[in-house]
Swiss-Prot record:
It comes from the Bacteria. The basic functional RuBisCO is composed of a large chain homodimer in a 'head-to-tail' conformation. In form I RuBisCO this homodimer is arranged in a barrel-like tetramer with the small subunits forming a tetrameric 'cap' on each end of the 'barrel'. It comes from Rhodobacter capsulatus (Rhodopseudomonas capsulata). One of its GO terms (molecular function) is ribulose-bisphosphate carboxylase activity. This is Ribulose bisphosphate carboxylase small subunit. Keywords: Calvin cycle, Carbon dioxide fixation, Photosynthesis. One of its GO terms (biological process) is reductive pentose-phosphate cycle.
Amino acid sequence: MSTVQDYPSRLSRPESRKMGTFSYLPPMGEAEIRRQVEWIVKNGWNPGIEHTEPDFAAQIYWYMWKLPMFGETDVDAILAELKACHEANPGHHVRLIGYDNFTQSQGANMIVYRGTAV
């Protein structure tokens, strides 16, 4: 029987919280983020961008950056919007969501830029 490793994530320590599909993996570089955006587009999902303060990241509500990018297939345009959101909200977490029209749910959800915890 294998042992279960305790992950030291605590609500009292915002920098330790894990959120999103890839949060337990090492941070992704630009090339890996690009591949994930390409995958979202290839699946026909609609990208959406949200952001919030790190202290409130565990709550349900995040601020939506503009409207979801319905039908957007240009990966560079999606990456540019992610960067614009990060530049406008430098201390916030910025996440990319892939909305799946068929299942009417989120098909992907990942933090692209991590904010600084207070």
